[in-house]
């Protein structure tokens, strides 16, 4: 089979006659293609017709022929497709519907529809988010989403719970930046935080037994009675608490020390034990745990060092790998060195070794000394923990543990370290805590490491030493402190060494530099100095090579330098406890000292604490300091109020009961009783406080209601209570009783007209009971036996023969307490009340003391001339009621009117004399008509008192 390209008479196709191809267009001859390639020969450029191409280009043209062959088959397929057309069903035919459903299910998803679906889904999501936000905004007030989330504070608490030692730095650390000589800030070097010792299981360790009770009472102590022991403790100002504390001693011979220790004590110039030593040493020798609290310079150090020596000498000697027997823990390096020197002084009598372990010293030297063996280790908490972790020593042989200045260690953040040290020591150890101040919170923490402790307190907790004279200088501003110090520094150095306290390290360096410029030789001590420098400064200060030492609070505790005579608080302390320790550097061991504190007007907060500290130490408090302290609100509120106290109004009704004026309350100037016994009866004890008072109040309100709310008609007969105005109100608020019966009209002669004789006290007693008033009058009483002034006798029980001034005083009292305090009543009292100008006094002036009988006769005659139609036999309140109903004058109708009370007792009718008495009497009646009984008062007649 041959392939025929066609052309000159030859048919195109394969060389078999199976099919024929229709003739098409004649193929046009191909134009010669001009090649622009670089392979074209040079001859072709010059009109050569021969087409010379590279071999690979010819291959390419041959490929083009193959493409033509392939197109032939494509044309054949197109022709065949036109012949065999697919079946296309008609519209709406079942086959078309099946094809549609099939194509819909089998066909791929349209991209546009997929994109639109995505857009709709995203829009729906956005709408849902917007709706949720709207709901959150609507409920934002009632719902807090941050409750479930951990805020900064909760994160801090969680972090502190997971890291209990985080952020615990000594108190002497300052946050301020230090600067070099060029003024560039020095990066602060933070101290390494010391982790506490890990817990230890003491049940897995077998400790050898030891003895800790070495105290035997002296015969002189045993022979003392408990009362003598109590008196001695009171004399020494000691307070001891705890289970079975041992008796205190009063001499070194009572302690039972051997001759070697006593010789060393005498060599140290000790003459007699201090109060804390008198009680503390017996407790320590007995093997008991103790909390010792005493003022600075009271000998606390010797109180635990001497028992240590006795305790150590009873135990076996140290082996090469053994640790110490006694450990003394203190907060500062200076205190550590000082206690170490004391231990060496007293320990050399027994050839005992002591090692001081503190921060800043050579770690290698301290570890070498510990490995060689030492019975006593005086340390700071952090450095001891370092040596224990590095296996330089161990605490298995420790049986005597002392924490000096325990509250200071807890305040400095050493609580966890202190607890870990105590937990690493055997549980049956002996533990002692000493301090000058001991807050209750720190005491509670300290009791956790003690077993049945005995608390020994000398003086008040945190009080200042009375041997120290404290002087407080109040200056207007800070620069004035410098002027004050430079003027007095030479005077201070002439008496002894001077210690100047400054709060901040930068201020201490600045003050020291300024003093050096003024040619004052001094030393500087603060926490950022190297330990060698600090040791050299303290050594020079003790040797008196430098008279002045400027220091921060690192020198405030435990620094025992006897040459210090003056302490100057250039800056006030952070708290009053630090102030107590500051001034305690002087006046030690019974010596006298002076402490100056410089205050400015801005430091009123500390002034309040300072006032209490001075008062507790019996020091003088200046008026300027007290005024400055009073500027502080908490001190002003908590300060006691000096001066006279408020007088309590204590009546028969109970504490704070105040008698109401205008209701017949007793005055302090006038008595209402007729004799002395009546006043005494008013203060009879009541059977029940609340019961009597309640009943008295009920009766008082009931009587007041009946007195005030009466009939409006003047002709209405008044009830008995409306005219019972002679009974005064008692302190319990009750009304007095009145006679229950009256003598018949006309039985008594006109001259006699006596009042009730045995009217003891017009009112209730303090217990709310009725006073004794007779229920009737005697049948025949002469006027000479019962004068008119009997009812209104003085408090001392004056008889009828007293002068008329008594009537005048009582009339004044009735006018004050009986009348109402309304303006109308006061006006009537002022113009028409004749009680202050009673007829008895005026009649006494005219007749030279004729007596009250003539006054009463004249009064009765005058009253009869006025047409008041009084009956001679009736002298009580009943006549007053009938008389007021006839005359239409409401003089006796109101219980508030003092005239009604006076005339119901039968006395007011004898108060008027002559015409003057008539005018006064009528004016009184007309002025007293402003009551509830008569709504419209009548016109008042003009009297002589109107002018």
Swiss-Prot record:
SUPFAM superfamilies: P-loop containing nucleoside triphosphate hydrolases (SSF52540). PANTHER family: ATP-DEPENDENT RNA HELICASE DBP3 (PTHR47958). It is found in: Cytoplasm; Nucleus. Transient component of the SF3B subcomplex of the 17S U2 SnRNP complex. It catalyses: ATP + H2O = ADP + phosphate + H(+). Residues 938-947 have a biased composition (Basic residues). Keywords: ATP-binding, Coiled coil, Cytoplasm, Helicase, Hydrolase, Nucleotide-binding, Nucleus, RNA-binding. Signal peptide: none annotated. Its EC number is 3.6.4.13. Residues 484-629 form the Helicase C-terminal domain. This is ATP-dependent RNA helicase DDX42. Residues 34-54 have a biased composition (Polar residues). ATP-dependent RNA helicase that binds to partially double-stranded RNAs (dsRNAs) in order to unwind RNA secondary structures. Unwinding is promoted in the presence of single-strand binding proteins. Also mediates RNA duplex formation thereby displacing the single-strand RNA binding protein. ATP and ADP modulate its activity: ATP binding and hydrolysis by DDX42 triggers RNA strand separation, whereas the ADP-bound form of the protein triggers annealing of complementary RNA strands. InterPro entries: DEAD/DEAH_box_helicase_dom, Helicase_ATP-bd, Helicase_C-like, P-loop_NTPase, RNA-helicase_DEAD-box_CS, RNA_helicase_DEAD_Q_motif. ATP binds at residues 294-301. Residues 805-929 have a biased composition (Basic and acidic residues).
């Amino acid at each position: 089979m041959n392939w025929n390209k066609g052309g000159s008479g030859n048919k195109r196709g394969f060389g078999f006659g199976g099919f024929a191809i229709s003739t098409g267009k004649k193929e046009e001859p191909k134009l010669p293609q001009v090649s622009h390639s670089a392979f074209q020969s040079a001859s072709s450029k010059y009109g050569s017709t021969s087409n010379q191409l590279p071999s690979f280009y010819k291959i390419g043209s041959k490929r083009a022929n193959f493409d033509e062959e392939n197109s032939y088959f494509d044309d054949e397929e197109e022709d065949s497709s036109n012949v065999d057309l697919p079946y296309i069903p008609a519209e709406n035919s079942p086959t078309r519907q099946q094809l549609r459903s099939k194509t819909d299910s089998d066909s791929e998803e349209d991209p546009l529809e997929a994109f639109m679906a995505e857009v709709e889904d995203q829009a729906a999501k956005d709408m849902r988010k917007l709706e949720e936000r709207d709901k959150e905004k609507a409920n934002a007030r009632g719902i807090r989403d941050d409750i479930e989330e951990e805020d900064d504070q909760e994160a801090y608490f969680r972090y502190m719970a997971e890291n209990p030692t985080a952020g615990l730095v000594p108190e002497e650390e300052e946050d301020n930046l230090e600067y070099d000589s060029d003024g560039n800030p020095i990066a602060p070097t933070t101290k390494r935080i010391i982790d506490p010792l890990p817990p230890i299981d003491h049940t897995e360790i077998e400790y050898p037994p030891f003895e800790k009770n070495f105290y035997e009472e002296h015969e002189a102590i045993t022979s003392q009675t408990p009362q003598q022991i109590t008196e001695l403790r009171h004399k020494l100002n000691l307070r001891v608490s705890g289970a079975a504390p041992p008796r205190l001693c009063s001499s070194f011979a009572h302690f039972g020390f051997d001759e070697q220790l006593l010789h060393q004590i005498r060599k140290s110039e000790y003459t007699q034990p201090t109060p804390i030593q008198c009680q503390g040493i017996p407790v320590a020798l007995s093997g008991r745990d103790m909390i010792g609290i005493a003022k600075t310079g009271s000998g606390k150090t010797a109180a635990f060092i001497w028992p240590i020596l006795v305790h150590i000498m009873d135990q076996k000697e140290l082996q090469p790998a053994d640790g110490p027997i006694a450990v003394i823990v203190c907060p500062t390096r200076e205190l550590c060195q000082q206690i170490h020197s004391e231990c060496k002084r007293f320990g050399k009598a027994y050839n005992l070794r002591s090692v001081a372990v503190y921060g800043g010293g050579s770690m290698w030297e301290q570890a070498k000394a510990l490995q060689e063996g030492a019975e006593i280790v005086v340390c700071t908490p952090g450095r001891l923990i370092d040596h224990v972790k590095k296996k330089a020593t161990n605490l298995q042989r420790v049986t005597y543990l002392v924490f000096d200045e325990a509250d200071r260690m807890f305040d400095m953040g050493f609580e966890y370290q202190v607890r870990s040290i105590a937990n690493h020591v055997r549980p049956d150890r002996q533990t002692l805590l000493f301090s000058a101040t001991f807050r209750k919170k720190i005491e509670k923490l300290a009791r956790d490491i003690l077993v049945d402790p005995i608390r020994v307190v000398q003086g008040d907790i945190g009080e200042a030493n009375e041997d120290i004279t404290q002087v407080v200088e109040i200056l207007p501003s800070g620069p004035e402190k410098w002027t004050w110090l430079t003027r007095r520094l030479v005077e201070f150095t002439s008496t002894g060494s001077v210690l100047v306290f400054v709060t901040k390290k930068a201020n201490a360096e600045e003050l020291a530099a300024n003093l050096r410029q003024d040619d004052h030789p001094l030393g500087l001590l603060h926490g950022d100095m190297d330990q060698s420098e600090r040791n050299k400064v303290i050594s020079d200060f003790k040797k008196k090579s430098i008279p002045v030492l400027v220091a921060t609070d690192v020198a405030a505790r435990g620094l025992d330098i006897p040459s210090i005579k003056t302490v100057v608080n250039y800056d006030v302390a952070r708290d009053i406890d630090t102030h107590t320790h500051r001034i305690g550097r002087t006046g030690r061991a019974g010596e006298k000292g002076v402490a100056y504190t410089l205050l400015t007007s801005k430091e009123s907060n500390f002034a309040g604490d300072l006032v209490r500290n001075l008062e507790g130490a019996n020091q003088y408090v200046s008026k300027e300091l007290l005024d400055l302290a009073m500027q502080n609100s908490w001190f002003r509120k908590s300060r006691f109020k000096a001066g006279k106290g408020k007088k309590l109004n204590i009546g028969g009704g109970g504490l704070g009961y105040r008698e109401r004026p205008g209701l017949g309350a007793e005055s302090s100037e006038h008595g209402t009783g007729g004799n002395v016994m009546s006043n005494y009866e008013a203060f009879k004890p009541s059977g029940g406080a609340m019961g009597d008072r309640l009943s008295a109040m009920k009766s008082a309100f009931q009587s007041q209601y009946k007195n005030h709310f009466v009939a409006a008609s003047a002709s209405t007969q008044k009830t008995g209570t409306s005219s019972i105005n002679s009974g005064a109100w008692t302190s319990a608020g009750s009304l007095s009783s009145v006679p229950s019966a009256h003598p018949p009209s006309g039985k008594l002669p006109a001259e006699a007209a006596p009042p009730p004789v045995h009217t003891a006290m017009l009112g209730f007693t303090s217990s709310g009971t009725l006073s004794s008033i007779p229920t009737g009058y005697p049948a025949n009483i002469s006027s000479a036996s019962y004068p008119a002034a009997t009812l209104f006798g003085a408090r001392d029980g004056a008889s009828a023969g007293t002068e008329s001034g008594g009537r005048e005083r009582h009339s004044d009292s009735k006018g004050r307490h009986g009348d109402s305090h309304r303006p109308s009543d006061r006006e009537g009292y002022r113009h028409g009340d004749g009680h202050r100008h009673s007829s008895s006094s005026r009649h006494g002036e005219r007749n030279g003391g004729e007596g009250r009988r003539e006054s009463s006769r004249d009064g009765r005659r005058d009253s009869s001339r006025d047409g008041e139609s009084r009956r001679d036999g009736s002298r009580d309140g009943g006549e007053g009621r009938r008389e007021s109903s006839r005359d239409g004058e409401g003089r006796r109708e109101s219980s508030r009117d003092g005239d009604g009370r006076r005339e119901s007792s039968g006395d007011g009718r004898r108060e008027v004399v002559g015409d003057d008495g008539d005018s006064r009497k009528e004016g009184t009646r007309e002025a007293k008509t402003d009551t509830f009984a008569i709504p419209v008062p009548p016109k008042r007649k003009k009297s002589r008192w109107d002018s």
